Amino acid sequence: METSVVRQTLAVLHPAGIIDNKAVELYNYINNVNEYTIVVPDADVLSCVCGTNDNNLKLIENHLGTPVFTRGNELSVNTDDSSVRQEFQYIIDRIVDEINDGSRNTGDIIASVLNIERRADVEQTSILVPGALRKIYPRTQNQADYIMSMRRHDMVFCYGAAGSGKTFLAVAEALRLLLSRQKSKMIISRPVVEAGESLGFLPGDLQDKLNPYLRPFYDAMEMIIPRETVKRLVEAGAIEIAPLAYMRGRTLNNSVIILDEAQNTTVEQMKMFLTRMGEGAKVFVAGDITQTDLPKRVQSGLVHAANLLSSIKEIGMNRLTAEDVVRNPLVKKIVKAYENEQNESE
């Protein structure tokens, strides 16, 4: 029986839209055939996978150490090495998943997939929020480690460059915990007195004054779940977005709590925030120690806490660098230049 006939007879539809031919793999093994084939039914998706002039396939070939062949809507490798076959399947699955979720920059997708070390725990780092617009994948090894840290620890600090995903991933993981009913409330906070501005002198009511500071949280959530869902959760009180000063005197139980722009907290404010943690709570603290707006002689609460609490094994400490920046590629170069200057001055 020809392989194509076996494939047509025994193909199993993969949830991501790939026909994953496990039956064909068994047939090939029994008949000592080395070809491992994945069928991508959608021609547009296949074109994105291959890339312009098959540039993406060349990257995959270099990574696998074996040629990748295309025939119609099929991608194949000729190898009897099960680890290579599994890696090939994993890479194509990931690319197709992200394309189906709306991503079209497959060069970035492939770079992120190939740069992340494939370990059993890393494969569990995608974030699937119930009712989400798309699945969230880590783009770098550091991001994957950050997600694992949020899963393993009840308190996690992450400091890193602008655009490295520290806040977005924390918001995504918090939404997952909330919408899967593992936590009853999601609270997001940040210090609101920045760059010399004081709320009392800004125009409008309290909400008008807070919106410019808290808008990034809404932007992040609306990239993950529909805007109507965000609005409904906020109105129901399941999601609370508030300035840091509103945390004083509270005990937050069974909640997931995010403190963003933590570099702009004082030592006293950081202590106040961390001690709000109640039973069943998770706390994610994110900030960029290179962008503090505090007066020069005021120590950052983030820097102080990262040093003071680093020996407590129950607290996760993560750092993201310029290599983890996922905004415009030019941003990565800018961040790298500032990092280099800071390292030279230290």
Language-model features, listed with the residues they occupy:
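N-terminal amphipathic/basic-hydrophobic helices that include classical n-h-c signal peptides
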Residues: 1-31
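Accessory, non-ATPase domains that flank or precede helicase/AAA+ motor cores in DNA-metabolism machines
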Residues: 24-90
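Intrinsically disordered, low-complexity linkers and terminal tails enriched in Pro/Gly
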Residues: 26-30, 110-126, 342-346
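Interdomain boundary/hinge elements
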Residues: 31-41, 95-110, 316, 320
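Interdomain "pre-motor" coupling segment immediately N-terminal to P-loop NTPase/helicase cores
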Residues: 69-123
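Conserved adenine-nucleotide phosphate-binding loops and their immediately adjacent elements
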Residues: 123-135
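Conserved helicase motor core of SF1/SF2 NTP-dependent helicases
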Residues: 133-259, 263-346
